[in-house]
């Protein structure tokens, strides 16, 4: 893992991002992924720095606020051989980017989305994020939160994500295994990571979560995997119901997994059989610094003199 580490970072001491970063680094290493084929994409926020803090030959893309998923989908569809991982905060993915978050579920592109869920906008001094519950007042808020919250698990499942899980930033070993399963899953995977923010959220602290989280896989009766089509509705309903548990006990682990749904790449390949062998990223677009497509004749007809 040492080869993936950088020598510096500028997160606050105790930030949950450290656990997510470590779990991600270990997952990439243990899966034996080709570093040249791993692309990290992030939005704006404290989580947006993840591509800077994992050393990869292809590095990553630090994109616009709320637009990480759209960049990631474009990268994956242009070159489906790449392993694309998105990191975004709860505000980035479920606030300004929530339209893209929902729309992505319809396509089921084969990539992984990691949502850093700390209940606040940490980079801009702790305003309430979309996952903070109505009436909760953190130390950074002058008054209790005036908005209701979004349930990331339920939203992802109802939007069409085919792998939906939750991890806890301070349980790195467990989170690492979830990330590995999400990456290996064929389809769109979302991991909601409970991430304490010691600087701005004094409610959902390490002590708060340590007493409450429990692992779904410790229940032998819990089976989130859809094995045949007729199981889908029942598994989805149970997963959404389970995601409503909050307070004294908060579940972490895999809520829902369904590999019976075709990926977007497979759907494209059905219409364009050469797609996977010759994706858009392999197209020659320039020669000796000049574009291979000449639009001069087209523009001549539209030139105004």
Curated annotation (Swiss-Prot):
Keywords: Iron, Iron-sulfur, Magnesium, Metal-binding, Oxidoreductase, Thiamine pyrophosphate
Uppermost EC category: oxidoreductase
InterPro entries: 2-oxoacid:Fd_oxidored_beta, 2-oxoacid:Fd_oxidoreductase, OFOB, PFO_beta_C, THDP-binding, TPP_enzyme_TPP-bd
Record's cofactor remark: Binds 1 [4Fe-4S] cluster per subunit.
Binding annotation for thiamine diphosphate: 44-47, 65, 91-92, 122-123
Reactions catalysed: a 2-oxocarboxylate + 2 oxidized [2Fe-2S]-[ferredoxin] + CoA = an acyl-CoA + 2 reduced [2Fe-2S]-[ferredoxin] + CO2 + H(+)
Site (Plays an important role in the binding of CoA): 125
UniProt: Mg(2+) binding residues: 90, 118, 120
Classification via Pfam families: PFO_beta_C, TPP_enzyme_C
Recorded GO MF terms: 2-oxobutyrate synthase activity; 2-oxoglutarate synthase activity; 4 iron, 4 sulfur cluster binding; magnesium ion binding; pyruvate synthase activity; thiamine pyrophosphate binding
Cofactor(s) required, per the database record: [4Fe-4S] cluster; thiamine diphosphate; Mg(2+)
The UniProt record lists the keyword Iron-sulfur: yes
pH dependence of activity: Optimum pH is between 7-8.
Positions contributing to [4Fe-4S] cluster binding: 12, 15, 46, 197
Enzyme Commission number, as recorded: 1.2.7.11
Temperature effects on activity: Optimum temperature is 70 degrees Celsius.
Cystine pairs: none
CDD domains reported for this sequence: TPP_OGFOR
NCBIfam families, A to Z: Oxoac_fdxbeta_Archa, PorB_KorB
Assembly description: Heterodimer composed of an alpha and a beta subunit.
Function text: Catalyzes the coenzyme A-dependent oxidative decarboxylation of different 2-oxoacids such as 2-oxoglutarate, pyruvate and 2-oxobutyrate to form their CoA derivatives.
Protein name as catalogued: 2-oxoacid:ferredoxin oxidoreductase subunit beta
Source organism of the structure: Saccharolobus solfataricus
């Amino acid at each position: 893992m040492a080869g993936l580490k950088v020598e510096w970072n500028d997160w606050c001491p105790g930030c949950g991002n450290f656990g997510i970063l470590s779990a991600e680094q270990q997952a990439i290493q243990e899966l034996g992924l080709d570093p040249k084929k791993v692309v990290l994409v992030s939005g704006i926020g404290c989580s947006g720095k993840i591509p800077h803090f994992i050393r990869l030959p292809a590095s990553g893309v630090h994109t616009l606020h709320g637009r990480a998923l759209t960049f990631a989908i474009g990268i994956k569809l242009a070159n489906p051989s790449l392993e694309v991982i998105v990191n975004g905060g709860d505000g980035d993915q479920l606030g300004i980017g929530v339209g893209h978050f929902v729309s992505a579920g319809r396509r089921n592109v084969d990539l992984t989305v990691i949502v850093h869920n700390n209940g606040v906008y940490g980079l801009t001094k702790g305003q309430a994020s979309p996952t903070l519950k109505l009436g909760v007042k953190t130390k950074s808020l002058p008054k209790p939160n005036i908005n209701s919250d979004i349930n990331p698990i339920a939203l992802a499942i109802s939007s069409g994500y085919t792998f939906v899980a939750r991890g806890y930033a301070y349980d790195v070993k467990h989170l690492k295994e979830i990330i590995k399963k999400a990456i290996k899953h064929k389809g769109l995977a979302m991991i909601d990571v409970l991430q304490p923010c010691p600087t701005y959220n004094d409610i959902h602290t390490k002590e708060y979560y340590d007493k409450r989280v429990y692992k779904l896989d410790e229940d032998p009766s819990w089976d989130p995997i859809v094995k045949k089509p007729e199981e889908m509705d029942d598994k989805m309903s149970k997963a959404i119901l389970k995601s409503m548990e909050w307070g004294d006990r908060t579940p972490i682990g895999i809520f829902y997994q369904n590999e019976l749904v075709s990926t977007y790449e497979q759907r494209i390949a059905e219409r364009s059989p050469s797609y996977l062998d010759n994706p858009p990223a392999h197209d020659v677009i320039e020669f000796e610094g000049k574009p291979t497509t000449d639009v001069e004749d087209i523009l001549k007809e539209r030139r105004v003199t």
